[in-house]
Amino acid sequence: MSLTNTKTGFSVKDILDLPDTNDEDGSVAEGPEEESEGPEPAKRAGPLGQGALDAVQSLPLKSPFYDSSDNPYTRWLASTEGLQYSLHGLAASAPPQDSSSKSPEPSADESPDNDKETQGGGGDAGKKRKRRVLFSKAQTYELERRFRQQRYLSAPEREHLASLIRLTPTQVKIWFQNHRYKMKRARAEKGMEVTPLPSPRRVAVPVLVRDGKPCHALKAQDLAAATFQAGIPFSAYSAQSLQHMQYNAQYSSASTPQYPTAHPLVQAQQWTW
């Protein structure tokens, strides 16, 4: 014990010339540990235990805080100021979070703008609908009546009709265009676009032979009535030619004997013109 007591006069703190950090760092960082370890030095006897304890307490406080070569993460634990700096950094980063949290606000502002745009578009559509002219019954009747008479109007006629029914020439023009299109579409749906074939032409043929006997009592008036019904013009020249045909038929029938024929038109070969 005597040897150890003589050696304890030279403590590790005196040899290394280390400053006493119990008041500076130990009070801040190792305060609870000193309170918990405070009763232990009282149990130990002699200055050796006290000096060794001081040396052990002083060494761990310096090595992890300032020796950054072994552990690069110790720079964050260098001092309480660093921790405060990190906290300040977090506090400084808080406003951007607030700004990011406030970032959806423009979207909320944009939605009313979009609504306004949609409302504006709806307003335009409403204006376009309002621009549509509703014709009265009198105006429609007059337009349809004029359309049946004349499907295309010139500029003066259009202006005159517009002044009569209290419309603008442009409105009259558009109405005529739309009505022509409607009529054309209606005809196309009903199949009226196909032009009908012309009716066959009817030709009036005088009856010269009836029941195997020539008809001598055929008069010009009967022929005129027949041709009038058929739509063929009748003239005096055609009546004279008919009389000439009757005369030739009588002469030929008197000169030649009557033979029974299979068809009454065979006698037409004996006629002379």
UniProtKB/Swiss-Prot annotation:
<feature type="region of interest" description="Disordered">
    <location>
        <begin position="91"/>
        <end position="131"/>
    </location>
</feature>
<comment type="subunit">
    <text>Interacts with OLIG2.</text>
</comment>
<dbReference type="GO" id="GO:0007224">
    <property type="term" value="P:smoothened signaling pathway"/>
</dbReference>
<dbReference type="GO" id="GO:0003700">
    <property type="term" value="F:DNA-binding transcription factor activity"/>
</dbReference>
<keyword id="KW-0805">Transcription regulation</keyword>
<dbReference type="GO" id="GO:0061101">
    <property type="term" value="P:neuroendocrine cell differentiation"/>
</dbReference>
<dbReference type="GO" id="GO:0010628">
    <property type="term" value="P:positive regulation of gene expression"/>
</dbReference>
<dbReference type="GO" id="GO:0045944">
    <property type="term" value="P:positive regulation of transcription by RNA polymerase II"/>
</dbReference>
<dbReference type="InterPro" id="IPR017970">
    <property type="entry name" value="Homeobox_CS"/>
</dbReference>
<dbReference type="GO" id="GO:0048714">
    <property type="term" value="P:positive regulation of oligodendrocyte differentiation"/>
</dbReference>
<dbReference type="GO" id="GO:0006355">
    <property type="term" value="P:regulation of DNA-templated transcription"/>
</dbReference>
<dbReference type="GO" id="GO:0003326">
    <property type="term" value="P:pancreatic A cell fate commitment"/>
</dbReference>
<feature type="compositionally biased region" description="Acidic residues">
    <location>
        <begin position="20"/>
        <end position="38"/>
    </location>
</feature>
<dbReference type="GO" id="GO:0014003">
    <property type="term" value="P:oligodendrocyte development"/>
</dbReference>
<comment type="similarity">
    <text>Belongs to the NK-2 homeobox family.</text>
</comment>
<feature type="DNA-binding region" description="Homeobox">
    <location>
        <begin position="128"/>
        <end position="187"/>
    </location>
</feature>
<dbReference type="GO" id="GO:0048708">
    <property type="term" value="P:astrocyte differentiation"/>
</dbReference>
<dbReference type="GO" id="GO:0045665">
    <property type="term" value="P:negative regulation of neuron differentiation"/>
</dbReference>
<dbReference type="GO" id="GO:0000987">
    <property type="term" value="F:cis-regulatory region sequence-specific DNA binding"/>
</dbReference>
<dbReference type="GO" id="GO:0030858">
    <property type="term" value="P:positive regulation of epithelial cell differentiation"/>
</dbReference>
<dbReference type="GO" id="GO:0003329">
    <property type="term" value="P:pancreatic PP cell fate commitment"/>
</dbReference>
<dbReference type="GO" id="GO:0045666">
    <property type="term" value="P:positive regulation of neuron differentiation"/>
</dbReference>
<dbReference type="GO" id="GO:0043565">
    <property type="term" value="F:sequence-specific DNA binding"/>
</dbReference>
<protein>
    <recommendedName>
        <fullName>Homeobox protein Nkx-2.2</fullName>
    </recommendedName>
</protein>
<dbReference type="GO" id="GO:0048565">
    <property type="term" value="P:digestive tract development"/>
</dbReference>
<keyword id="KW-0238">DNA-binding</keyword>
<dbReference type="GO" id="GO:0021522">
    <property type="term" value="P:spinal cord motor neuron differentiation"/>
</dbReference>
<dbReference type="GO" id="GO:0048709">
    <property type="term" value="P:oligodendrocyte differentiation"/>
</dbReference>
<dbReference type="GO" id="GO:0031018">
    <property type="term" value="P:endocrine pancreas development"/>
</dbReference>
<dbReference type="GO" id="GO:0030154">
    <property type="term" value="P:cell differentiation"/>
</dbReference>
<dbReference type="GO" id="GO:0005634">
    <property type="term" value="C:nucleus"/>
</dbReference>
<dbReference type="GO" id="GO:0003309">
    <property type="term" value="P:type B pancreatic cell differentiation"/>
</dbReference>
<dbReference type="GO" id="GO:0003327">
    <property type="term" value="P:type B pancreatic cell fate commitment"/>
</dbReference>
<dbReference type="GO" id="GO:0048468">
    <property type="term" value="P:cell development"/>
</dbReference>
<dbReference type="GO" id="GO:0060580">
    <property type="term" value="P:ventral spinal cord interneuron fate determination"/>
</dbReference>
<dbReference type="GO" id="GO:0003323">
    <property type="term" value="P:type B pancreatic cell development"/>
</dbReference>
<dbReference type="GO" id="GO:0021530">
    <property type="term" value="P:spinal cord oligodendrocyte cell fate specification"/>
</dbReference>
<keyword id="KW-0539">Nucleus</keyword>
<dbReference type="GO" id="GO:0021554">
    <property type="term" value="P:optic nerve development"/>
</dbReference>
<feature type="region of interest" description="Disordered">
    <location>
        <begin position="1"/>
        <end position="56"/>
    </location>
</feature>
<keyword id="KW-0371">Homeobox</keyword>
<dbReference type="GO" id="GO:0030182">
    <property type="term" value="P:neuron differentiation"/>
</dbReference>
